[in-house]
Amino acid sequence: MSTMTVLRLMLETLTSRLHAAISRVCEADMTPLAETGELLRIMQIMQREAIGSEHDREGDKDAKRRRLRRLREKIARLREHNEHPVGNSHEAAYQANARIKTDDVALAMIDDALKGL
């Protein structure tokens, strides 16, 4: 499977989670909007990586591994930064938890892809 295919599958998974979060916004509770924003943030990072992977050769597992590890490092740095909420309100804590949860999902997907290489 090419790097582009792996990243595309990850984006499709995140897109389905995004769709589910948006459909929950119609409820009285608007908190899924935070999750929606976080999913979009991670999807944008993955999309940039997918654009860069278009020139990778089809069978080049080393390039795929390097690209996925670099992506994992970026998201891990973001997750570490998100562990420190800005502000003392409940909303700040909720935002930080939403970011961490989304980062953890992305990291797990990347780890699964790396195990398959």
Regions found by a protein language model. Give the residues of each.
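Short intrinsically disordered terminal tails
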Residues: 1-5, 52-61, 86, 108-117
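Residue-level detector of intrinsically disordered terminal segments
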Residues: 3, 9, 29, 42-45, ...
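A structural signal for well-ordered alpha-helices, especially hydrophobic packing surfaces
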Residues: 18, 22, 43, 47-50, ...
